[in-house]
Amino acid sequence: MKFLDSAKIYIRSGDGGAGCLSFRREKFIEFGGPDGGDGGRGGDVVVECVGGLNTLIDYRYQQHFKAKTGVHGMGKNRAGGRGADAVLKVPVGTQILDEDGETMIADMTEAGQRLVLARGGNGGFGNAHFKSATNQAPRRVNPGQEGVERTVLLRLKLIADAGLVGLPNAGKSTFLATVSAARPKIADYPFTTLNPQLGVVGCDGREFVLADIPGLIEGAHEGIGLGDRFLGHVERCRVLLHLVGADTEHAGKAYKTVRRELEAYGGGLADKPEIVALSKVDSVDPDTLKQQAMRLKRAAKRAPLQLSAATNLNVQKALRAVLAEIDAAAVADAAGTAADAVVWAP
């Protein structure tokens, strides 16, 4: 399935049904009076968050959505039926923005979450509604209220517990394929990964979701390479696993390049907990490995993990470190929520 993380759609709720102009006509009833029913309400445009989706590709081929018009009122005081809703299904993690691209309407973060984007128009009154002591045979009816029309933007930010970042060819896809059932494309040339990939990782009887995003290069925040637009998919991650290939020219410079791009992107990415690992250690000789490890240690100001996804060296150690950071972030979030809670007192 092709990946698409943004879409512009045009929506319109249904018009209300018109009221009915009708009079009671029966044998032996000389003055039957008005019996026109009210029109039905127009359908709503509803966004529903569903599990099992991780792309907005459906909205590439259809951008216009309109709910059904309410049924018109009928004689014998019969009201019209309600118009059918237009339901838009989106993946978990979809943000709904106004046409300006900045005003947030909603953030769909849970499966089953529903939001009415455009409410249908009310149905018009039939002539029975206007009967009075001074007007026994009204010929007045209301048309249905018009529906609401608007343009909205959908932006998907995948929800993962941890994110893989690094330069192209740092071994991110190989790592994801080793620790999960995900099967990203793997090759020895840059930008093999063109779209974010998700994998469910098992570690010590527990599971978490790991996201692999396309590699960053210097100047990505200015649009060079694939740009930095995919960094939005790790905004929700609680921890970043930063892989630096041991076969790169200078591990320290490679690390600093990615850090500069994270800081330039903003969104709090540079402040997230980070685990630094020197990957592909099986691809270099011991002297080169020692030199690269020292360079990375000086740049990151901490001793990096040394791992190899191809030989499984220290892979479990890296996963346990990620899991520990996820747990620490969860505890911090819970403490923050408790601190913000208002204590009720009589």
UniProtKB/Swiss-Prot annotation:
Annotated Gene Ontology cellular component terms: cytoplasm
Presence of the UniProt keyword Metal-binding in the record: yes
Top-rank lineage group of the source organism: Bacteria
Main location: cytoplasm
Gene3D superfamilies recorded: GTP1/OBG domain, P-loop containing nucleotide triphosphate hydrolases
InterPro entries named among the record's database cross-references: G_OBG, GTP-bd, GTP-bd_Obg/CgtA, GTP1-OBG_CS, GTP1_OBG_dom, GTP1_OBG_dom_sf, OBG_GTPase, P-loop_NTPase
Domain Obg: 1-159
Uppermost EC category: hydrolase
Binding locations of GTP: 166-173, 191-195, 212-215, 279-282, 308-310
Chain positions recorded as Mg(2+) binding sites: S173, T193
Molecular function via GO: GTP binding; GTPase activity; magnesium ion binding
Keyword annotations from UniProtKB, A to Z: Cytoplasm, GTP-binding, Hydrolase, Magnesium, Metal-binding, Nucleotide-binding
Record localization: Cytoplasm
CDD domains given in the database record: Obg
Pfam families for the chain: GTP1_OBG, MMR_HSR1
Enzyme Commission number(s) from the entry: 3.6.5.-
Domain OBG-type G: 160-327
The protein's required cofactors: Mg(2+)
GO biological processes: ribosome biogenesis
Quaternary context: Monomer.
Stated role: An essential GTPase which binds GTP, GDP and possibly (p)ppGpp with moderate affinity, with high nucleotide exchange rates and a fairly low GTP hydrolysis rate. Plays a role in control of the cell cycle, stress response, ribosome biogenesis and in those bacteria that undergo differentiation, in morphogenesis control.
Family: Belongs to the TRAFAC class OBG-HflX-like GTPase superfamily. OBG GTPase family.
Name this polypeptide is given: GTPase Obg
Gene: obg
